[in-house]
């Protein structure tokens, strides 16, 4: 969702790199966000894609504790508010497996009355709403803005085959299952920027490309997320069944 190949130093068509299992992509020894080095700060490993989204690829000693606390907040929002139900259904890795619920709520409308029903995971219908907006303002030649032009969402969903029995519907009875998402475009955009930024560092090194305002955007100091993050507003291609995610 990031026009990143065109933004960072004019680099396009980044080579595809495949990782399997827990992998160190690069050893940095400096905070990639604020610049603190190992002499000044306790540095932690930084996942390119959040661990909560299934990633095991990381930059070693790449974030100070203060910056890690900032990135953790928007990554938790993405993992819980946007991908939360999807992660539970798919059994995506978590650092707190004992806290994973055995039931999830569904938002149901029957005969004009809306209510919530707790369902076991195998009976639970869910939605995944991925925010999307227009191409980055930088690529469109417009001034930085806090607006998200064309903001909408790609909506994916799963309805189990036994939904009639799960909702205890009688023959001919119709139920409307409604999305129940609260994704925030700013936090989602910062998470996408962080993935793109870390991926560029993995490929080119910390000093191998022009950062522009990306570190400040990721840390929340540059408020114009849509100036550097965006997408072509079109239907996404079919997912690659051979991998969990693709960064390009």
Locate predicted features.
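Extreme N-terminal basic, low-complexity initiation segments
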Residues: 2-6
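Alpha-helical structural context detector biased toward long hydrophobic helices
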Residues: 7, 11-13, 17-29, 38, ...
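Short recognition patches in nucleic-acid-associated and regulatory proteins
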Residues: 39-52
């Amino acid at each position: 969702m990031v026009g990143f190949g065109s933004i960072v130093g004019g680099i396009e068509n980044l080579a595809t790199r495949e990782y399997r299992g827990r992998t160190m992509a690069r050893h940095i020894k400096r905070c990639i966000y604020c610049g603190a080095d190992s002499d000044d700060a306790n540095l932690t490993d930084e996942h390119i894609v959040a661990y909560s989204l299934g990633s095991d690829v990381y930059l070693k000693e790449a974030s100070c504790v203060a910056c890690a606390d900032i990135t953790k907040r928007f990554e938790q929002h993405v993992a819980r508010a946007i991908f939360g139900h999807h992660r539970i259904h798919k059994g995506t890795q978590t650092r707190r497996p004992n806290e994973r619920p055995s039931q999830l709520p569904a938002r149901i409308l029957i005969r004009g009355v809306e209510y919530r029903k707790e369902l076991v995971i195998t009976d639970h219908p869910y939605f995944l709403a991925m925010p999307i907006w227009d191409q980055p303002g930088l690529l469109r030649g417009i001034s930085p803005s806090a607006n998200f032009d064309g903001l909408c969402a790609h909506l994916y969903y799963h309805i189990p085959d036994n939904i009639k029995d799960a909702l205890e519907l009688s023959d001919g009875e119709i139920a409307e299952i409604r999305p129940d998402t609260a994704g925030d475009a700013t936090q989602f955009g910062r998470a996408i920027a962080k993935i793109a930024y870390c991926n560029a560092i993995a490929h080119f090194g910390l000093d191998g490309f022009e950062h522009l305002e990306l570190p400040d955007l990721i840390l929340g100091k540059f408020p114009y997320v849509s100036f550097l993050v965006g997408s072509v507003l079109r239907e996404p291609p079919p997912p690659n069944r051979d991998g969990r995610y693709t960064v390009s």
